[in-house]
Amino acid sequence: MKQTILLSFLIFMSGQFWAQDTFSIVAVDTITGEIGSAGASCLDNIQFPGSNGAIIISDILPGRGAIHTQSYWHATNQANARLRMEEGMSPDQIIAWLKANDAQGGFAWVNRQYGVVDFDAQGHPRSAALTGNGCLDWKGHRLGTNYAIQGNILLGPQILDSMEARFLAATGSLSDRLMACLQGANVPGADSRCLQNGTSSLSAFVRVAKPGDADDNLWLDLNVPSLPAGMEPIDSLQRLYDQWKMTLNSPVPHTQNMTPVLAPNPASGWFMLQIFTEQAQLELFDLAGRQVFRQELWKGDNKLIPSIPAGVYFARIQSGQKLLHTLRLIWQP
């Protein structure tokens, strides 16, 4: 969730928590550096005004990672999770810290469910999850190298199995795979309390941050906070997503298949970047999402000699306001 909204909830909703039935995924893309978050819940903005629905569980730190805090959601736990990620803790360390420092103390952590993903200092993906014994059944999580899928008060384990299978089988961008994951739970009663409504959930969202995005201005940020009774939030979100994809700038004419070429990679001291548009700009971002280098590019080969520390960077190539491509660069001065 955007940091400003999260801080507002700390003031407005301090002490409030809900046993919301929720299924969700957090994931990273090691090629593009994108970080994604998607989910749905039988909590919506009508039941809990100001929550904006399921999206309340989501917090993305562009260039670093994403955190979902669900089941007896508590604003302080979510804010603390963000702070721990900003301090550099790994997903496993963040969850261990939250268990030891729950906002309500004692054994309150047994009611919580968390999913966390990030990039380590070398750009490798990491994931972790926690499903406390106090979460309501059916509850559980699924972990992969670059994703965490979790849910509670579900129809059964088949919901998470389907979500994971759809995510792994999907092709395309990270956002395409997140939507496929949600569609894996698009059955009446996926969140069991919504069975009487004939829907999987009451609210749904999908979000993706590219390297360099601001917390409050993500590349993709779609939300269905509530709907009339009987309408399926995942279907509504899919329509919003399909419409959003149509608004993306079309590829430059005659260069649809001409992906920029960066070599050598890993690079030491210099690298070449070949582009197929007349002019573009290169921006390099570190894993904290900070811009560390920028240079104009011209059609053909461009030799680049950035003065940056060793590490993993994401090269963002754009023409004007249009993003052309994002590449991963391993830099070894």
Say what each PLM segment does:
Residues 275-280:
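Short proline/glycine-enriched turn/loop motifs at strand-loop junctions of beta-rich domains
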Residues 281-285:
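Beta-strand signatures of extracellular beta-sandwich domains
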Residues 20-248:
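N-terminal nucleophile
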Residues 246-263, 333:
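Residue-level detector of functionally pivotal "anchor" positions at catalytic/ligand-binding pockets or at interdomain
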Residues 291-294, 301, 305, 310-333:
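C-terminal tail/sorting-segment detector
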Residues 15-19:
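Sec/Tat signal peptide C-region and signal peptidase I cleavage site
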Residues 4-13:
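Sec-dependent N-terminal signal peptides
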Residues 265-272:
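Short coil/turn motif common to extracellular beta-sandwich-like domains
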